[in-house]
Amino acid sequence: MQIDGLPAIGTFHHIGVATEGIAEAEGTYAALGYAREGDEFCDHAQGVRGVFIVGPGPRLELLEALGASNTLDPWLRAGSRMYHLAFEVDDLDGTLALARSRFQALVLRSPTPAPAFGGRHIAFVMLRNRAVIEFIEADRSAMPDQSNEPVRP
């Protein structure tokens, strides 16, 4: 995400979609060419169950409340389904500091391990325009080795 000449914040990952039921939403998106990517997950810390789907557009994360959780209620009551944009970042703490200092973002959830990402940490912020952004700690295992191996021509 490049804003006003600032360095890129991270790589776009997905749009979070609040649902009253994943199965029904998945059927709707299947008609648009979307299919499940990976297994369903439960995140008890956030009070949600979810699944990622991919298709002709951006990756979507379909979420529904776990049990009596009210995590998604504000968006569902307002009729807003797509409620957050997610970006994978190399430096989660640095990105949060930048979001707070440059964008006056409010941290909604401090870094916490997320089952959806194999325990990698995530954090949520709200920008002044009330947009909710999720930052996902980059997958270090997928990054190139930064050891002191000699550079080959």
Annotate each PLM feature.
Residues 1-13, 17-37, 54-108, 118-153:
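Glyoxalase I/VOC metalloenzyme domain signal
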Residues 44-48, 116-120:
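Short acidic/glycine-enriched loop/turn segments that link adjacent beta-strands
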Residues 36-44, 112-114:
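Conserved catalytic-core motifs of GNAT/GCN5-like acyltransferases
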